[in-house]
Amino acid sequence: MESIGVLLTCPMNPYLEQELDKRFKLFRFWDFPSANDLFREHSNSIRAVVGNSFIGADAQMIEALPKMEIVSSFSVGLDKIDLVRCKEKGIRVTNTPDVLTEDVADLALALILATLRRICESDRYVRSGSWKKGDFKLTTKFTGKSVGIIGLGRIGSAIAKRAEGFSCPISYHSRTEKPGTNYKYYPSVVELASNCQILVVACALTPETRHIINREVINALGPKGVVINIGRGLHVDEPELVSALVEGRLGGAGLDVFENEPNVPEELLAMDNVVLLPHVGSGTVETRKDMADLVLGNLEAHFLNKPLLTPVV
């Protein structure tokens, strides 16, 4: 397979890059002055693309690479891949589900706890020497709080299971009601927000879920409510979130993703009731290796004419 051209769209993981280089003829997108230079020189050599949640395979890339057979994404989310165009051209698409579910669910709970118990602010309080001047203020408990989850898929279900361990009543919103669950279902996000204290975004990004957290939803959640986003930045209308936090219409937020990463609204940086993370939901050594192995396994399966491990298209 050493002669098969594979395009890596951006730096992702050292192990993945090393293994791609060993097993295939690797092209690194960032080694070229522009996309046009890459396409002009190697359009007929590239048969596979490895993308992620930042750079995938858009219509321009798909059209520019006529020999492309498969896109293997180093992510679960596929919003950076033109799936319609891939289907039209018979290009296979894979992702990395399941292997990152536990890490992302763990992080969601960590964000909830950090936001409610002001863990980051408490840490700064000790480091700054403020503790010597007096005790830290009281915070809010998590146990028993009602948790609403948008998207009860693999990750949403794992979050619900963890929250149950804190005696939290669970409710959810999904495209359809899930059979076999005892959680309360709400057909609209506004209804869900009106009936929970912590609202967690765990759904896929689609045109329908873009800005699913908007002014109406935030107002329904209320001034004591907390938004947790471990989905995609575009799930949240960021200007509306910022204004709600500034005006006290929302109690707090724990955010792992943002609309225009790595840029974060300036106003959020000074807020102690907001916890900000640099999109690290799956960011553990173990999980990133598992994700890389899944990408590699899908590529090898495709080029050996074997069934794909995690086919999407």
From Swiss-Prot:
The active site is at 232, 261, 279 (proton donor). Coiled coil: none annotated. Disulfide bonds: none annotated. Its EC number is 1.1.1.26, 1.1.1.28, 1.1.1.79, 1.1.1.-. GO terms for molecular function: D-lactate dehydrogenase activity; glyoxylate reductase (NADH) activity; glyoxylate reductase (NADPH) activity; hydroxypyruvate reductase (NADPH) activity; hydroxypyruvate reductase [NAD(P)H] activity; NAD binding. InterPro entries: D-isomer_2-hydroxyacid_DH (IPR050223), D-isomer_2_OHA_DH_cat_dom (IPR006139), D-isomer_DH_CS1 (IPR029752), D-isomer_DH_NAD-bd (IPR006140), NAD(P)-bd_dom_sf (IPR036291). It catalyses: L-idonate + NADP(+) = 2-dehydro-L-idonate + NADPH + H(+); L-idonate + NAD(+) = 2-dehydro-L-idonate + NADH + H(+); (R)-glycerate + NADP(+) = 3-hydroxypyruvate + NADPH + H(+); glycolate + NADP(+) = glyoxylate + NADPH + H(+). SUPFAM superfamilies: Formate/glycerate dehydrogenase catalytic domain-like, NAD(P)-binding Rossmann-fold domains. Optimum pH is 7.5. Optimum temperature is 37 degrees Celsius. Keywords: NAD, NADP, Oxidoreductase. Pfam families: 2-Hacid_dh, 2-Hacid_dh_C. NADP(+) binds at residues 152-155, 174-176, 230, 256. It is an enzyme of class 1 (oxidoreductase). It comes from the Eukaryota. GO terms for cellular component: cytosol. Forms homodimers. Involved in the biosynthesis of L-tartarate from L-ascorbate. Catalyzes the NAD(P)H-dependent reduction of 2-dehydro-L-idonate (2-keto-L-gulonate) to L-idonate. Can also reduce hydroxypyruvate to glycerate, glyoxylate to glycolate and pyruvate to D-lactate. Prefers NADPH to NADH as proton donor. Belongs to the D-isomer specific 2-hydroxyacid dehydrogenase family. This is Glyoxylate/hydroxypyruvate/pyruvate reductase 2KGR. It comes from Vitis vinifera (Grape). The lineage of its organism: Eukaryota, Viridiplantae, Streptophyta, Embryophyta, Tracheophyta.
